[in-house]
């Protein structure tokens, strides 16, 4: 059973710079069954979703950092690193970002994009080959995220 659906995005926010993020949302296949179990125990799903997203984001951010070290991790990238925080959008939606934020350091977020996707050949600096360090880190943590989410839900639903 997959508990959370995650997807990777590079966003340009008008006037607010670039954000390299992993977005995660709670998506359960047996959602009705889970809700019924939690309702019987008078459990609220909001704290469960927050905990699942936070722990998933922490695992993912750690993997991104480890992968970035191997692929030319710069001081600017360290300064632009996002500290994962779960935000509640509405009653049923939560968001937790990981990656690099240009609001903290624009050069760091841009460096992360260039190291991940590469650049075309340039006269001054040559071509930067794509490493896909961000994308690989997200894919490599998929099973860990699923396992921790499953563990959290099963603990609460017992």
Q: What are these model-predicted stretches?
A:
Residues 106-121:
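Extended Gly/Ser/Thr-rich low-complexity repeat segments
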Residues 2-96, 117-158:
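Short, Lys/Arg-rich flexible segments
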Residues 93-105:
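Short, hydrophobic/proline-enriched secondary-structure or compact coil segments at domain edges
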